[in-house]
Amino acid sequence: MKTQLEGDRVLAGKEAVAELYKTGYFGRPREDGLELSLVEAAYLQFRGKIEIELEGRKLDFRALFEQASLRQPNFELKYIVYKDLKERGYYVQPSAADFRVYPRGSHPGKSAAKIFVHVLSERQPLPVKLLQDSVISAENVHKQFILAVVDEESDLTFYEIKTASPQGEMPEPYPEVKTDATFLEDRVIAWDAEASGALYAGGFYGKMLDPERLQLSLVESLYLFSRGIIVVRDRKDRIFSFDEFVEKASEIESSFLRKYGAYKALRDSGHVVKTGFKFGTHFRVYRKVESIEKIPHSEYLVNVIPSDYEFRLPVMSGAVRLANSVRKRMLFAVEKEEGVEYLDISRVKM
């Protein structure tokens, strides 16, 4: 079947509607025939279904690929993903998100598409704002959002990305105690044995320095300080104000306030939040800890990122792979003017 390359589309005659669209749902019917996207046309040419001409000259697969790459950004990446999905048995159509994918056993006209697929090279940065907008747009129309990443060897990795609203099950975010604590170099120590035990056993705050004293992280300390649970003094016994604590903590760790915002949101929603250093993340998060003698596995790993953050996909891939390998969900907490928003990213098989 002869077709014509025009701009970023390939045009076929009316006979293509019956042969290509009604049997395989390729392209979009028009009054005068069928309009194919460049990836659809390249796939059909690869399968020997069509011939493509440009200004009277027949294009072989190489010539078409070169022309398409000039006419459409990321063409080769999109072709790799499109061909992979087709060979997995999916009906795939181009869309604003790159592709919409229909459930197995279904097709256009039988049911709605289930998945939006966005395609990127492993080398391309991904602004978190763009990612959030894309995910929310998909969820607003009840679609699953999949990010297809093509590495330098043209292997594919698929990630499901969705918004999240994690809810913990701790009955109270902190026990009803009040005690003094001292800000040392980069952590805080509570000295009272009874209060230390209550904070550790009742809310899994900090780590016991010994049977009587509790050492607290900076974010834990500010959270308890803000609720009147601890009074924080410096090493000369001067009491800190809230702003003074924030200033000193921010000198120690430049991202302190951002981390604290996520810590506060997670604690306020009923979680137990501990450092995620051993996993290379900011936090590991538990839905509920009933006993410090029998601590369960954490549910999430959380990285806190600013609203103007750009994902580097190899870094994102490493974080997600580690989280999935230890049976945890990887959440990215995006800083907002008030609170945080979460993106849940996991590796999936198509």
UniProtKB/Swiss-Prot annotation:
Stored InterPro entries: tRNA_endonuc-like_dom_sf, tRNA_intron_Endo_cat-like_sf, tRNA_intron_Endonuc_cat-like, tRNA_intron_Endonuc_N, tRNA_intron_Endonuc_N_sf, tRNA_splic, tRNA_splic_arch_long
SUPFAM superfamilies from the UniProt entry: tRNA-intron endonuclease catalytic domain-like, tRNA-intron endonuclease N-terminal domain-like
Please list the disulfide bridges.
Answer: none
Keyword Lyase assigned: yes
* GO BP: any one term: tRNA splicing, via endonucleolytic cleavage and ligation
Database matches in Gene3D superfamilies: 3.40.1350.10, 3.40.1350.150, tRNA intron endonuclease, N-terminal domain
Q: What is its EC number?
A: 4.6.1.16
Q: Which GO terms describe its molecular function?
A: endonuclease activity; lyase activity; nucleic acid binding; tRNA-intron endonuclease activity
Record-level GO cellular component terms: cytoplasm
Pfam families (UniProt xref) = tRNA_int_endo (PF01974), tRNA_int_endo_N (PF02778)
Q: Which reaction is the catalytic activity of this chain?
A: pretRNA = a 3'-half-tRNA molecule with a 5'-OH end + a 5'-half-tRNA molecule with a 2',3'-cyclic phosphate end + an intron with a 2',3'-cyclic phosphate and a 5'-hydroxyl terminus
| Subunit structure, interactors included | Homodimer.
Q: Which HAMAP family match?
A: EndA_long
- Entry's family note: Belongs to the tRNA-intron endonuclease family. Archaeal long subfamily.
Q: What does this protein do?
A: Endonuclease that removes tRNA introns. Cleaves pre-tRNA at the 5'- and 3'-splice sites to release the intron. The products are an intron and two tRNA half-molecules bearing 2',3' cyclic phosphate and 5'-OH termini. Recognizes a pseudosymmetric substrate in which 2 bulged loops of 3 bases are separated by a stem of 4 bp.
Protein name per UniProt: tRNA-splicing endonuclease
Natural source organism: Methanosarcina acetivorans (strain ATCC 35395 / DSM 2834 / JCM 12185 / C2A)
Q: What is the lineage of its organism?
A: Archaea, Methanobacteriati, Methanobacteriota, Stenosarchaea group, Methanomicrobia
Give the gene name: endA
